Amino acid sequence: KYFVTLDNSKKIEVIDPETFGSVGTILYTQAGFPRQIVAISPTEAIVSDLERQLVRIRTVEPYGEPLEYISIPRSVEYLVTVDNKIFGMTTGGIYVFDTDNISKKAVRVIPEVKNDENTKTCRMLVDKYQRVWALMNIREGNRVCGIELVCIDPHQEKVEVSHTLPISEKANPQAGDVIGTITYNRTDIDPTLNWIYFNVKTCKSNTAAGITSVQSVYRMNIGTGEFEHYLDLPGIDMMYGFSVSPQGEVYLCDCLDYSAQRGYIRNYKKDGSIRNFRVGIYPSQVYFP
Protein backbone atom coordinates (compact mmCIF):
# COMPACT_ATOMS: atom_id res chain seq x y z
CA LYS A 1 0.00 0.00 0.00
CA TYR A 2 0.97 3.64 -0.49
CA PHE A 3 0.45 6.08 2.38
CA VAL A 4 -0.11 9.66 1.22
CA THR A 5 -0.24 12.70 3.49
CA LEU A 6 -2.65 15.43 2.40
CA ASP A 7 -1.36 18.99 2.78
CA ASN A 8 -3.24 21.29 5.17
CA SER A 9 -5.28 18.39 6.46
CA LYS A 10 -5.41 16.05 9.41
CA LYS A 11 -5.44 12.84 7.44
CA ILE A 12 -3.43 10.25 5.57
CA GLU A 13 -4.93 8.31 2.69
CA VAL A 14 -4.09 4.64 2.15
CA ILE A 15 -3.81 3.98 -1.59
CA ASP A 16 -4.00 0.71 -3.53
CA PRO A 17 -0.76 0.51 -5.60
CA GLU A 18 -2.55 -0.92 -8.66
CA THR A 19 -5.84 0.95 -8.84
CA PHE A 20 -4.61 4.12 -7.06
CA GLY A 21 -7.95 4.21 -5.26
CA SER A 22 -8.26 4.96 -1.57
CA VAL A 23 -8.68 1.86 0.60
CA GLY A 24 -8.54 3.59 3.95
CA THR A 25 -8.05 6.85 5.84
CA ILE A 26 -6.06 7.63 8.97
CA LEU A 27 -7.75 10.65 10.51
CA TYR A 28 -6.07 12.72 13.22
CA THR A 29 -8.03 13.37 16.40
CA GLN A 30 -6.06 16.54 17.20
CA ALA A 31 -4.39 19.41 15.33
CA GLY A 32 -1.85 18.40 12.73
CA PHE A 33 -0.30 19.08 9.34
CA PRO A 34 1.16 15.72 8.25
CA ARG A 35 4.11 15.93 5.87
CA GLN A 36 6.44 12.95 5.31
CA ILE A 37 6.28 9.28 6.32
CA VAL A 38 9.02 6.75 7.19
CA ALA A 39 8.51 3.13 8.21
CA ILE A 40 9.97 2.07 11.57
CA SER A 41 8.76 -1.55 11.48
CA PRO A 42 6.72 -3.85 9.22
CA THR A 43 3.54 -2.59 10.91
CA GLU A 44 4.23 1.02 11.98
CA ALA A 45 5.50 4.32 10.59
CA ILE A 46 6.33 7.81 11.83
CA VAL A 47 4.83 10.91 10.20
CA SER A 48 6.50 14.32 10.40
CA ASP A 49 4.27 17.30 11.11
CA LEU A 50 4.43 21.09 11.04
CA GLU A 51 2.78 21.19 14.48
CA ARG A 52 6.06 20.31 16.26
CA GLN A 53 5.12 16.70 16.66
CA LEU A 54 5.80 13.25 15.26
CA VAL A 55 2.82 10.97 14.76
CA ARG A 56 3.00 7.18 14.99
CA ILE A 57 0.58 5.30 12.71
CA ARG A 58 -0.31 1.71 11.89
CA THR A 59 0.55 0.55 8.34
CA VAL A 60 -1.52 -2.64 8.45
CA GLU A 61 -5.26 -3.02 8.91
CA PRO A 62 -7.10 -1.83 10.88
CA TYR A 63 -5.59 1.59 10.17
CA GLY A 64 -7.87 3.56 12.48
CA GLU A 65 -6.57 6.62 14.27
CA PRO A 66 -2.91 7.51 14.93
CA LEU A 67 -1.36 5.41 17.68
CA GLU A 68 0.53 8.27 19.32
CA TYR A 69 1.23 12.01 19.07
CA ILE A 70 4.80 12.78 20.17
CA SER A 71 5.62 16.40 21.03
CA ILE A 72 9.09 17.62 19.96
CA PRO A 73 10.87 21.00 20.42
CA ARG A 74 10.92 21.99 16.72
CA SER A 75 9.01 20.90 13.64
CA VAL A 76 10.62 18.38 11.30
CA GLU A 77 9.74 17.83 7.66
CA TYR A 78 11.99 15.19 6.11
CA LEU A 79 12.99 12.04 7.99
CA VAL A 80 15.26 9.07 7.27
CA THR A 81 15.77 5.84 9.19
CA VAL A 82 19.16 4.15 9.54
CA ASP A 83 20.42 1.60 12.07
CA ASN A 84 17.16 1.64 14.06
CA LYS A 85 17.40 5.42 14.39
CA ILE A 86 15.34 8.28 12.99
CA PHE A 87 17.11 11.42 11.72
CA GLY A 88 15.16 14.63 11.12
CA MET A 89 16.54 18.04 10.16
CA THR A 90 15.34 21.23 11.89
CA THR A 91 16.40 24.87 12.13
CA GLY A 92 18.14 23.96 15.40
CA GLY A 93 20.07 20.92 14.18
CA ILE A 94 19.42 17.30 13.25
CA TYR A 95 17.23 15.43 15.72
CA VAL A 96 18.09 11.79 16.38
CA PHE A 97 15.71 9.27 17.96
CA ASP A 98 15.90 5.54 18.57
CA THR A 99 12.96 3.90 16.82
CA ASP A 100 11.96 2.14 20.04
CA ASN A 101 12.17 5.31 22.16
CA ILE A 102 10.74 8.31 20.31
CA SER A 103 10.13 11.11 22.79
CA LYS A 104 11.07 14.70 23.57
CA LYS A 105 13.26 13.53 26.48
CA ALA A 106 15.11 10.96 24.38
CA VAL A 107 16.06 13.21 21.45
CA ARG A 108 19.74 13.87 20.65
CA VAL A 109 20.83 16.83 18.52
CA ILE A 110 23.62 17.26 15.96
CA PRO A 111 23.68 21.08 16.25
CA GLU A 112 26.06 22.02 13.42
CA VAL A 113 23.78 20.61 10.67
CA LYS A 114 20.58 22.62 10.32
CA ASN A 115 18.22 23.91 7.68
CA ASP A 116 16.86 27.35 6.83
CA GLU A 117 13.84 28.66 4.93
CA ASN A 118 15.26 27.75 1.50
CA THR A 119 16.74 24.35 2.42
CA LYS A 120 13.92 22.96 4.57
CA THR A 121 12.48 21.39 1.40
CA CYS A 122 15.62 19.28 0.84
CA ARG A 123 15.29 15.59 1.56
CA MET A 124 17.85 13.96 3.80
CA LEU A 125 19.46 11.10 1.87
CA VAL A 126 21.08 7.74 2.69
CA ASP A 127 24.00 6.55 0.53
CA LYS A 128 25.23 3.03 -0.26
CA TYR A 129 27.34 3.01 2.90
CA GLN A 130 24.25 3.78 5.01
CA ARG A 131 25.50 7.28 5.79
CA VAL A 132 23.12 10.23 6.07
CA TRP A 133 23.53 13.33 3.87
CA ALA A 134 22.04 16.79 4.29
CA LEU A 135 22.28 20.04 2.29
CA MET A 136 23.00 23.43 3.86
CA ASN A 137 23.57 26.94 2.53
CA ILE A 138 26.85 28.47 3.73
CA ARG A 139 26.70 32.18 4.54
CA GLU A 140 29.10 35.07 4.93
CA GLY A 141 26.97 37.71 6.59
CA ASN A 142 23.76 37.95 4.59
CA ARG A 143 25.29 36.44 1.46
CA VAL A 144 25.07 32.75 0.56
CA CYS A 145 28.61 31.89 -0.54
CA GLY A 146 28.32 28.14 -1.03
CA ILE A 147 26.22 25.00 -0.94
CA GLU A 148 27.47 22.35 1.46
CA LEU A 149 26.66 18.65 1.44
CA VAL A 150 27.27 17.20 4.89
CA CYS A 151 27.79 13.49 5.60
CA ILE A 152 26.77 12.15 9.02
CA ASP A 153 27.97 8.90 10.55
CA PRO A 154 24.71 7.44 11.92
CA HIS A 155 26.48 5.24 14.45
CA GLN A 156 28.57 8.03 15.99
CA GLU A 157 25.87 10.65 15.32
CA LYS A 158 28.59 13.04 14.18
CA VAL A 159 29.63 14.81 10.99
CA GLU A 160 32.04 12.59 9.06
CA VAL A 161 32.89 14.83 6.11
CA SER A 162 31.47 17.76 4.14
CA HIS A 163 31.94 19.14 0.64
CA THR A 164 31.20 22.70 -0.50
CA LEU A 165 30.30 24.00 -3.95
CA PRO A 166 31.33 27.68 -3.92
CA ILE A 167 29.16 30.37 -5.46
CA SER A 168 31.04 32.66 -7.82
CA GLU A 169 31.87 36.17 -6.63
CA LYS A 170 32.99 37.30 -10.07
CA ALA A 171 31.77 40.70 -11.18
CA ASN A 172 31.58 39.31 -14.72
CA PRO A 173 30.65 35.62 -14.48
CA GLN A 174 30.99 33.39 -17.50
CA ALA A 175 28.32 31.09 -18.91
CA GLY A 176 28.06 28.01 -16.71
CA ASP A 177 29.39 29.65 -13.53
CA VAL A 178 27.38 28.94 -10.37
CA ILE A 179 26.08 32.37 -9.36
CA GLY A 180 23.44 31.63 -6.73
CA THR A 181 21.10 29.31 -4.92
CA ILE A 182 17.41 28.83 -5.62
CA THR A 183 14.33 29.39 -3.51
CA TYR A 184 13.30 26.12 -1.85
CA ASN A 185 16.04 23.81 -3.05
CA ARG A 186 15.49 20.07 -3.49
CA THR A 187 17.68 16.98 -3.35
CA ASP A 188 17.66 13.40 -4.62
CA ILE A 189 20.02 10.43 -4.91
CA ASP A 190 20.42 8.02 -7.86
CA PRO A 191 19.51 4.29 -7.69
CA THR A 192 23.17 3.30 -7.19
CA LEU A 193 23.26 5.60 -4.13
CA ASN A 194 26.47 7.17 -5.46
CA TRP A 195 25.29 10.54 -6.81
CA ILE A 196 23.46 13.29 -4.94
CA TYR A 197 21.46 15.77 -7.05
CA PHE A 198 20.51 19.33 -6.09
CA ASN A 199 19.75 22.67 -7.74
CA VAL A 200 21.65 25.92 -8.28
CA LYS A 201 21.42 29.08 -10.34
CA THR A 202 24.02 29.33 -13.12
CA CYS A 203 25.00 32.07 -15.53
CA LYS A 204 23.34 31.57 -18.90
CA SER A 205 24.91 34.56 -20.63
CA ASN A 206 26.79 37.75 -19.81
CA THR A 207 26.41 40.45 -22.44
CA ALA A 208 26.19 44.21 -22.65
CA ALA A 209 22.47 43.83 -21.97
CA GLY A 210 23.19 42.18 -18.63
CA ILE A 211 23.53 38.79 -16.96
CA THR A 212 20.88 36.13 -17.49
CA SER A 213 20.61 33.01 -15.37
CA VAL A 214 19.07 29.55 -15.54
CA GLN A 215 18.21 27.00 -12.89
CA SER A 216 20.53 24.00 -13.19
CA VAL A 217 20.89 20.57 -11.64
CA TYR A 218 24.28 19.77 -10.16
CA ARG A 219 25.37 16.47 -8.72
CA MET A 220 28.09 15.27 -6.35
CA ASN A 221 29.83 11.91 -6.17
CA ILE A 222 29.65 10.62 -2.59
CA GLY A 223 33.01 8.87 -2.90
CA THR A 224 35.15 11.69 -4.31
CA GLY A 225 33.16 14.75 -3.23
CA GLU A 226 33.50 16.15 -6.76
CA PHE A 227 30.71 18.33 -8.18
CA GLU A 228 29.58 18.46 -11.80
CA HIS A 229 26.91 20.16 -13.89
CA TYR A 230 24.17 17.70 -14.86
CA LEU A 231 21.28 19.45 -16.62
CA ASP A 232 19.73 22.88 -17.16
CA LEU A 233 16.06 23.51 -16.36
CA PRO A 234 14.98 26.40 -18.61
CA GLY A 235 11.75 28.14 -17.68
CA ILE A 236 11.82 27.13 -14.01
CA ASP A 237 12.32 29.62 -11.18
CA MET A 238 10.77 27.72 -8.28
CA MET A 239 9.45 24.19 -7.95
CA TYR A 240 7.27 22.15 -5.63
CA GLY A 241 9.01 18.81 -6.02
CA PHE A 242 12.08 17.28 -7.65
CA SER A 243 13.22 13.77 -8.47
CA VAL A 244 15.62 12.01 -10.81
CA SER A 245 14.27 8.85 -12.43
CA PRO A 246 16.22 5.56 -12.59
CA GLN A 247 16.93 6.49 -16.24
CA GLY A 248 18.51 9.77 -15.16
CA GLU A 249 15.67 12.05 -16.29
CA VAL A 250 14.62 14.99 -14.11
CA TYR A 251 11.00 15.34 -12.99
CA LEU A 252 9.67 18.55 -11.43
CA CYS A 253 6.40 19.57 -9.84
CA ASP A 254 5.35 23.01 -11.05
CA CYS A 255 2.26 25.07 -10.27
CA LEU A 256 1.23 28.03 -12.39
CA ASP A 257 -2.56 28.31 -12.16
CA TYR A 258 -3.10 29.01 -8.47
CA SER A 259 -6.75 30.07 -8.73
CA ALA A 260 -7.82 26.78 -10.28
CA GLN A 261 -5.44 24.69 -8.17
CA ARG A 262 -3.90 23.10 -11.22
CA GLY A 263 -0.29 22.31 -11.90
CA TYR A 264 2.18 20.42 -14.05
CA ILE A 265 4.65 17.59 -13.87
CA ARG A 266 7.60 18.53 -16.08
CA ASN A 267 10.00 15.91 -17.41
CA TYR A 268 13.43 17.16 -18.51
CA LYS A 269 15.21 14.58 -20.65
CA LYS A 270 18.96 14.32 -21.03
CA ASP A 271 18.69 15.14 -24.75
CA GLY A 272 17.26 18.56 -23.86
CA SER A 273 13.63 17.82 -24.71
CA ILE A 274 10.85 18.56 -22.20
CA ARG A 275 7.52 16.82 -21.61
CA ASN A 276 4.69 18.46 -19.64
CA PHE A 277 1.80 16.70 -17.91
CA ARG A 278 -1.10 18.78 -16.60
CA VAL A 279 -2.45 17.42 -13.32
CA GLY A 280 -5.55 18.16 -11.29
CA ILE A 281 -4.12 19.46 -8.02
CA TYR A 282 -0.96 21.13 -6.74
CA PRO A 283 1.72 18.48 -7.31
CA SER A 284 4.33 18.46 -4.56
CA GLN A 285 6.35 15.25 -4.79
CA VAL A 286 7.58 12.70 -7.33
CA TYR A 287 8.60 9.18 -6.26
CA PHE A 288 9.91 6.18 -8.17
CA PRO A 289 8.98 3.11 -6.07
Which residue ranges define each predicted feature?
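Short loop/turn segments that connect beta-strands within beta-propeller blades
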Residues: 16-20, 59-63, 98-103, 153-157, ...
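Structural motif
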Residues: 10-14, 53-57, 93-98, 141-150, ...
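A short beta-strand motif characteristic of beta-propeller blades
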Residues: 21-28, 63-70, 104-114, 158-177, ...
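Residue position within the beta-strands of beta-propeller blades
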Residues: 4-5, 47, 88, 134, ...
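Short coil/turn segments that connect the beta-strands within blades of beta-propeller domains
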Residues: 1, 42-43, 83-84, 129-130, ...
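Repeated scaffold domains used in trafficking and secretory/extracellular systems
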Residues: 32-39, 74-83, 116-127, 177-188, ...
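Intrinsically disordered, low-complexity segments enriched in Gly and acidic/Ser/Thr residues
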Residues: 163-261
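Blade-loop segments of beta-propeller domains
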Residues: 21-42
